[in-house]
């Protein structure tokens, strides 16, 4: 295994303790008003970013966007981890009516306002438009204290924001209340408009921030979990296919369901990545040599190398060139 990946997994490993309450299930240990969270020995910071028009872009623009995305990933610091999250959540009708609809003003234009509001409500009640999508990028790093973590985030957050802006994606940092609101909506589906949190007031009264976001109950079964009366399930991709369409993520997140899709990224130094690919290529060549030796021992001197071995050999050589 790659050394950096092995060290990261080792640092993330924690001793499991049986939770005594629903609050104990939430892994966050401490929060700060600026949005820095501590979980275990790691600190994290989250950015919210807007979507880009990739699906309708031309082939040249898609290539440019893909290369810009690659530059963003390559700019991430080794030793840190990054999580890209796409959050599909149900649109809260009461909140929509309060924030989006135009209130009547008692003049001659109220008829137009009423008609416009009816059109918006008709759009929202349609099942295909009842789910809104938000996107986040979360940076996490192991540091000795929050001051060192803030120094790291000051640099990396600015770099990530500038690269996202270069892709025409608006980006904003999220404070503690914003991040807790996301967790509240996840843990308390159907109660999105009931989120109330004042960090200063909580500290004054000695209340835990977890009380504001945790569900009433949480149960974990063999293949699903029950959270506040709602049933859920976690799926993960154990292995990737050799070819993945660029529309795969869009197809997964276009489901009309409340879901969170996360992509975890662990940056690896170039020299370690090249060494790993060279070892894999050496393994492929060894398999080919052993196969040919077996064929020769059977007096089969004209045998063609199996297609899967030849394909592995062809894919490994260009991969080393792209990494280096």
Predicted regions: what they are:
Residues 1-324:
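Extended, folded cores of ATP/NTP-driven motor/assembly subunits in large transport
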